[in-house]
Amino acid sequence: MNASIPAITTGPLPASSKVHVQGTLHDIKVPMRQIEISDECPLNVYDSSGPYTDTAISIDIAKGLADSRGIWLRSRGDVEEYDGRTITAVDNGFAEGERLTPAFPNQRRPLRAVGDRAVTQMAYARAGIITPEMEFVAIRENIGRTQALKEERDGEDFGASIPDFVTPEFVRQEIASGRAIIPANINHRELEPMIIGRNFLVKINANIGNSAVTSSMEEEVEKMVWSIRWGADTVMDLSTGRNIHNIRDWIIRNAPVPIGTVPLYQALEKVGGIAEDLTWEIFRDTLIEQAEQGVDYFTIHAGVRLHMIPLTARRVTGIVSRGGSIMAKWCLHHHRESFLYEHFEEICDICRRYDVSFSLGDGLRPGSIADANDAAQFAELETLGELTKIAWAKDCQVMIEGPGHVPMHKIKTNMDKQLEHCHEAPFYTLGPLTTDIAPGYDHITSAIGAAMIGWFGTAMLCYVTPKEHLGLPDRNDVKTGVITYKLAAHAADLAKGHPGAQMRDDALSRARFEFRWEDQFNLGLDPDTARAMHDETLPKQAHKVSHFCSMCGPKFCSMKISHDIRAAAEKQDGMEQMAEKFREGGQLYVPVTEPAE
């Protein structure tokens, strides 16, 4: 493989620049995207794109991003550097020679907790400590809220406790209670912290990853950068096949967002893909390997219990989770509970030393709407609630994964049961897909369900691309999935009544009514596509100031007609006001004329 540095997408989005807000409790600078608008003040929006859209920063992925958190971590006095485990051929799927992806060149010694301490954000929050990470996310969540204080709250939040203004203390309380998490491994020092919780903005995750048959390090790093450019808040690396360790290292060292994994996938590669040969020792070693690299959250399918597996026998689509099917096969072969369930407390002990958050996997999620809300799904959910309490007792951060395929009328039940059984831990759902009849369009079938469940209280939505059920998504699929899910998340924020959420909508609506085409493009989630579509029929620069588009033309544009009506009404109103003055004066108004010279 060519070890040269791959080309990475950089540069700001149209009419945009990076601005920073200074912290008050800690020496931090929180990045935001500022969009210039003609004849209006600039609009600041939440920005997860990291330094890649900052013209003041030079990107070299062979060096990785800046170590922005190192000083925060060391100042707490509870971490230590150590040599870490030795990387072996098995960690990269026995890739060798030209097939071996080069190791990331700028290696650091990993950090871990001193002694038996917990270095998690939950542990600090419970101790009453407001960390830099907590203040960082509070500032991010407050974008637009100061202006929104002037407006009346509008929305239905289904019992959430969304504040008018997010303070660092509010963040601390939410973390301490388990209602929110900040995925922030102490070895992911390049991270720009973000928060996942019901009382905060709805977040989205993008999945990337190579497979045994396709993709490379270059593609995966670019897919990560590409996905956060368009708004992904976290990225999951679901790589299988060769080079898993090295590809993951390149991704994390260049990722400003949290990175999640399913460690079971790599553990399975280490035993040649034979599920029955998996052991606790192999899995434990894989957890430590990934924790040392800086993985921020692990999907752990510990809720798949032996007695639940027969409940899936009558399903239309059986067990569709890769992790769930692997553990079900292991349990049946050994006729015992999974090592994930039996050793869950030991998994917690590993996670608390690095602050790796749990994403408790829904291994028995429904893979078709026919299987939605069945006994297997909800039996596992109850177990996930039990595991949540065990993790919380160890000061570990937890979120709960959810379905899947669920028709619209059954979605609310999923949210209600999750809140009940999992004690308000953040919910993280894949969609859900609301119908099964649209291969190639499952980004749409799932966005319908995602918007609904986000409104009901889900904290993070895992994107679905047009390639779902069909193949590995490419760069364009990733963008389509991210944009679609940003729409769903934003729609949920609006419906919940998040203060400030509507400011961007209103700014774009004003631009639309005033025929400010460039502002319309730039304020949208995807300026490039909006501009390209307009250019298809009206490509000239003069068309960018026209008071019509190709849909209606100049004579039938409803907004142009509205302008004419408004102008006529204002003229008529002016005449009426003048007539009223005449009536009040009781005489006609006679203008004064200058005397003739």
UniProtKB/Swiss-Prot annotation:
InterPro entries per the UniProt record, alphabetical: ThiC, ThiC-associated_dom, ThiC/Bza_core_dom, ThiC/BzaA/B
Ligand binding ([4Fe-4S] cluster): 549, 552, 557
Keyword field: 4Fe-4S, Iron, Iron-sulfur, Lyase, Metal-binding, S-adenosyl-L-methionine, Thiamine biosynthesis, Zinc
Keyword field contains tRNA processing: no
Broad EC category: lyase
Molecular function in Gene Ontology: 4 iron, 4 sulfur cluster binding; carbon-carbon lyase activity; zinc ion binding
Binding residues annotated for substrate, in chain numbering: 207, 236, 265, 301, 321-323, 362-365, 401, 428
Pathway annotation from the record: Cofactor biosynthesis; thiamine diphosphate biosynthesis
Catalytic reaction(s) noted: 5-amino-1-(5-phospho-beta-D-ribosyl)imidazole + S-adenosyl-L-methionine = 4-amino-2-methyl-5-(phosphooxymethyl)pyrimidine + CO + 5'-deoxyadenosine + formate + L-methionine + 3 H(+)
Subunit and interaction comment: Homodimer.
BP term (GO), one: thiamine biosynthetic process
Cofactor note text: Binds 1 [4Fe-4S] cluster per subunit. The cluster is coordinated with 3 cysteines and an exchangeable S-adenosyl-L-methionine.
One family name in Pfam for this protein: ThiC_Rad_SAM
Named cofactor requirement(s): [4Fe-4S] cluster
Organism from which the protein derives: Gluconobacter oxydans (strain 621H) (Gluconobacter suboxydans)
Family per record: Belongs to the ThiC family.
Domain of life according to the entry: Bacteria
Protein name (record): Phosphomethylpyrimidine synthase
